[in-house]
């Protein structure tokens, strides 16, 4: 399974080298009050949510000043429904999820503050993605790492774009 490589998860499974770093972004309604936000400071006071047990909910939402943080949603589709139905002003998620959401929900707008001083503060551990394997399965881990080493950043970006295009959120 592909997931963030955290110290806690490393206690249970082994991971390949990271193959993707997931930018953290916000989704708002294109005609909503936060559509022109240029950084997280512009999101102050927003009603927001995200998916449970994610860096988006646990680390990013608390960085929005005076945010009204709703209970965490059980899934990405649930958080998108919360935004689309007007229950919240914004959700925080990763770039692939947001890109697919904008295909499925054309009235949503993706806000990417990456590379600015006013972005969400996260560690590499919170955004790096690797393939988890059963602890101690070094044969599989070595083969996966060998395969990953043959791919370029452009290869990973192309595969991510292809995956976004065919995932259920994109099949509107």
Model segments located where?
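Proline/Glycine/Serine-rich low-complexity intrinsically disordered segments
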Residues: 1-172
